[in-house]
């Protein structure tokens, strides 16, 4: 038989391994429990933060876990206002609606590397904090377009209308001050008008087209040349791909410029944008347009098919040549 000292050492190692295994299982179980409750924990932290009743240590812990916006970076604060439910729609309990909104927002903003936790504040009000975590940061116009998309999804699937109140990005510690102003803005919406509303309408900076050719398509669509827009857009995508210029960033720029061009074409009318992307199939095209060249082409085909063709293809080509000159 082995000496007692060896048996003792082996036994001690075995006990240590068993204890380590138990500790690992406990940590795994704790991690799983936290993940299941992460949304609720973050929501509680948001409510406390906006009402200035938060514990700074708890906030820093959640920031370290990457589920709460960092205090040393700017972000956007959005008040989501549930306006009306359709007469035949089931009214969602606020916590379940918060889960649904979190899922929709995460799917919408994750492709832009935007953290987007949402917390229910009362039966009709929800707070969303947005902050870029990597890559190119979305501007206010981009944020507002994505909020319109969420509004369309809610109208289609949750069967309720919404209003969104926000302002330009600001340091996270200043968000409680802005929250009070957004609540006042919500209270002023006594007609329950849906849409995306800024706290103060500052003079808009002109959109800088990163794909300059797209800027001319606004005139083509307005004058009744959607077929020319489609042909030019398809050709441009193919040429950029052939030259090796097409990647995730350049496709995102193409998508954003194209959507901005559409926004200009309808005169900035949120109602017309809503009508254009109301159907589920259209919403999918809108959401997936920046994921691949094929998806972008499908979006272009849908948008241009929604405009009435007033001119012949030859006339469209002639005008396009003039615009290029």
Identify the function of each model-found stretch.
Residues 134-158:
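GGDEF/GGEEF active-site signature
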Residues 3-142, 169-175, 179-187, 194-219, ...:
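Interdomain helical linkers/hinges and coiled-coil/dimerization scaffolds
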Residues 107-108, 153, 235, 239:
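A generic secondary-structure signal
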Residues 15-18, 22, 109-112, 154, ...:
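Conserved NTP-handling cores and scaffolds of large molecular machines
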Residues 162-168:
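A short glycine-rich, hydrophobically flanked beta-strand micro-motif that places a catalytic Asp/Glu
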Residues 113-116, 120-126, 139, 155, ...:
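Cytosolic nucleotide-binding catalytic cores of signal-transduction proteins
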């Amino acid at each position: 038989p082995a000496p007692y000292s060896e048996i003792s050492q082996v036994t001690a190692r075995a006990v240590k391994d068993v204890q380590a295994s138990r500790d690992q299982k406990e940590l795994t179980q704790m991690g799983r429990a936290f993940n299941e409750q992460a949304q609720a924990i973050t929501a509680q932290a948001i409510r406390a933060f906006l009402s200035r009743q938060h514990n700074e240590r708890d906030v820093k812990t959640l920031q370290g876990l990457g589920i709460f916006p960092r205090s040393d970076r700017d972000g956007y604060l959005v008040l989501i206002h549930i306006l009306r439910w359709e007469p035949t729609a089931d009214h969602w309990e606020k916590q379940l609606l918060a889960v649904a909104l979190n899922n929709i927002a995460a799917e919408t903003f994750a492709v832009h590397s935007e953290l987007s936790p949402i917390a229910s504040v009362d039966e009709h009000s929800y707070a969303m904090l947005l902050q870029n975590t990597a890559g190119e940061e979305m501007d206010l116009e981009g944020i507002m377009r994505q909020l319109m998309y969420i509004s369309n999804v809610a109208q289609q699937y949750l069967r309720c209308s919404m209003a969104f109140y926000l302002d330009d990005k600001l340091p996270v510690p200043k968000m409680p001050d802005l929250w009070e102003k957004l609540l006042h803005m919500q209270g002023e919406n006594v007609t329950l008008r849906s849409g995306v509303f800024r706290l103060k309408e500052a003079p808009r900076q002109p959109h800088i087209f990163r794909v300059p050719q797209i800027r001319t398509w606004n005139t083509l669509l307005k004058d009744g040349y959607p077929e020319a827009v489609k042909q030019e857009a398809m050709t441009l995508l193919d040429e950029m791909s052939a030259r090796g210029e097409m990647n995730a960033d350049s496709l995102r720029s193409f998508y954003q410029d194209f959507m901005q061009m559409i926004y200009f074409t309808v005169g900035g009318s949120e109602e017309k944008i809503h009508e254009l992307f109301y159907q589920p199939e259209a919403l999918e095209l809108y959401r997936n347009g920046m994921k691949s060249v094929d998806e972008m082409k499908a979006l272009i085909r849908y948008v241009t098919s929604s405009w009435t063709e007033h001119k012949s293809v030859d006339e469209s080509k002639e005008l396009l040549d003039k615009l290029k000159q």
